[in-house]
């Protein structure tokens, strides 16, 4: 597949080559033309690649967010874990930005350019626009102001130093794009990406639900800065129809063989970078589950503990819940003598490289709807029933991810739900905290979406790790840093963004977090 995308990887070289050889002999050109080569990649192939690359960014620096949200830690100071807020972890935050623009942002832009003016491809155009919103939303939520309106225009319009759009403008446009795309999708048009659509295999109805679910997510993101707009978009999303059935979950499927792009990006990165290994003791970077996460699961008698976690006993993985133990993030540089006794992600669930990656779930829809109900924006169901449905869905989805290895007994689910009912007689703040404590566990391992909701709501109420020499004064990051290279290659646009948004600092809040 690499050859198919060479034109888009080296556009300037290709353009220069065309001008150099215009005077060449026709026969020479014919001799040097490979009749079996693909001169222009098919739109379907580019769409598949954009899906793969966009989903892969869930793994890119995902382990850093694991540490930041206190799921995991390491006794070493390594950039793979964000649990200590150290210089090496700070310097790693530009990676998502650097990796996104040459891949999924450029790729989905090429798809849109190819189909937007063809009235027979209205569904392809809508699907591509929805995926573009997904990719950009993940990017802007980490950095704030980013290149958006001029992004990916180097080959087409020779814009090599794109401006940074304000996050407020990006959000306004993304929400409008979702509305327009969802409206445009139609079952009367059969032109889709078919099996090249690795999420829904061309199912128009499911793409529509995905669009409205993203609208629900992004609309709720506005609650701190513009509650009126948040309510308006959330109401539209609910009316349009969001993901409520397991068959509609947005997910990418993977395999255990083939190239790395075919493997679950979260599991693959954790294993490939040696941050977490399934052998208990020979762990190069010293990663384990953090005590905050394991202690919470144990204290709440959460049946997911045995699904997510193992301790290696004499070289054999044990899911015995009584022996699970998290490692403190305060351990400094020296491998603890009892390292092997700390819990780590289970190989057959969390570290399963052929497990699907869930992009939007039934659990997330229900938790967001529960908050909407608390705010008085949705009255068809109670916050309590939506909250409970969210918990059940979050537990049952491990069966979808891992098969029978992830199955949780119905009796244990029922018992947990009964013990953690929403405190409807308490304040809205107390109930909101309950909802987002469940999001912390229920959306795992999507650490970025948990991080987004943590910044917006303040829940779960995590206690920062005041590690010696940390770079944030013992505070949890509020955003990622732009790549240092942007200060050289795109200085004017970078400076404008910093002046508007605030210092390029880990503690500067993005627009919707202010």
Model-inferred region functions:
Residues 59-68, 144-146, 230, 449-452:
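Beta-strand acidic-aromatic groove motif in beta-rich domains, primarily in extracellular
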Residues 72, 194-206, 316-317, 323-330, ...:
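Amphipathic alpha-helical surface "interface" segments used
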Residues 395-514:
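C-terminal functional modules
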Residues 40-42, 75-131, 135-402, 425-432, ...:
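Structured, solvent-exposed acidic/aromatic patches
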Residues 2-3, 8, 17-46, 53, ...:
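Bacterial Sec-dependent N-terminal signal peptides
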């Amino acid at each position: 597949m690499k050859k198919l995308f060479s034109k888009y990887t080296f556009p300037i070289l290709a353009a220069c080559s065309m001008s150099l050889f215009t005077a060449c002999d026709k026969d020479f050109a014919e001799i040097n033309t490979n009749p079996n080569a693909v001169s222009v990649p098919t739109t379907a192939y580019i769409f598949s690649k954009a899906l793969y690359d966009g989903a892969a960014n869930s793994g890119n620096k995902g382990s850093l967010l694991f540490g930041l949200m206190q799921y995991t830690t390491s006794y070493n100071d390594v950039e793979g874990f964000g649990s200590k807020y150290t210089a090496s972890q700070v310097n790693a935050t530009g990676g998502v930005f650097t990796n996104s623009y040459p891949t999924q942002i450029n790729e989905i832009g090429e798809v849109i350019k190819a189909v937007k003016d063809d009235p027979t491809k209205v569904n392809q155009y809508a699907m591509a626009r929805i995926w573009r919103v997904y990719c950009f939303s993940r990017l802007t939520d980490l950095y704030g102001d980013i290149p958006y309106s001029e992004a990916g225009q180097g080959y087409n319009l020779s814009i090599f130093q794109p401006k940074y759009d304000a996050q407020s403008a990006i959000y306004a446009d993304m929400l409008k794009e979702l509305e327009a795309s969802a409206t445009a999708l139609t079952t009367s048009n059969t032109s889709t990406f078919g099996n090249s659509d690795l999420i829904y295999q061309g199912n128009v109805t499911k793409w529509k639900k995905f669009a409205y679910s993203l609208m629900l997510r992004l609309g709720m993101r506005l609650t701190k800065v513009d509650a009126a707009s948040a309510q308006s978009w959330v109401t539209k999303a609910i009316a349009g129809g969001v993901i409520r059935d397991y068959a509609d979950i947005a997910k990418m499927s993977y395999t255990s063989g083939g190239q790395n792009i075919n493997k679950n990006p979260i599991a693959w990165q954790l294993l490939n970078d040696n941050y977490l290994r399934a052998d208990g003791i020979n762990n190069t970077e010293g990663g384990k589950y953090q005590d905050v996460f394991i202690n919470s699961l144990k204290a709440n008698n959460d049946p997911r503990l045995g699904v997510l976690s193992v301790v290696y006993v004499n070289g054999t993985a044990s899911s015995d819940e009584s022996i699970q133990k998290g490692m403190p993030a305060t351990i400094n540089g020296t491998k603890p003598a009892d390292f092997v006794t700390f819990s780590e992600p289970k190989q057959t669930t969390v570290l399963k490289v052929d497990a699907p990656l869930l992009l939007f779930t039934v659990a997330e829809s229900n938790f967001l709807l529960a908050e909407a109900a608390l705010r008085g924006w949705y009255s068809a169901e109670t916050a309590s029933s939506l909250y409970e449905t969210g918990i059940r869905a979050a537990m049952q989805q491990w069966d979808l991810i891992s098969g029978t290895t992830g199955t949780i007994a119905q009796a244990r689910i029922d018992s947990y739900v009964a013990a953690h009912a929403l405190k409807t007689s308490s304040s809205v703040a107390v109930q909101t905290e309950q909802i987002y404590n469940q999001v912390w566990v229920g959306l795992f391992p999507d650490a970025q979406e948990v991080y987004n909701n943590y910044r917006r709501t303040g829940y779960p109420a995590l206690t920062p790790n005041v590690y010696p020499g940390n770079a944030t004064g013992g505070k949890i990051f509020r955003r990622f840093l732009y790549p240092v290279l942007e200060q050289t290659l795109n200085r004017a646009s970078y400076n404008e963004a910093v002046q508007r948004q605030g210092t390029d600092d880990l503690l500067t809040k993005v627009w919707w977090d202010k």
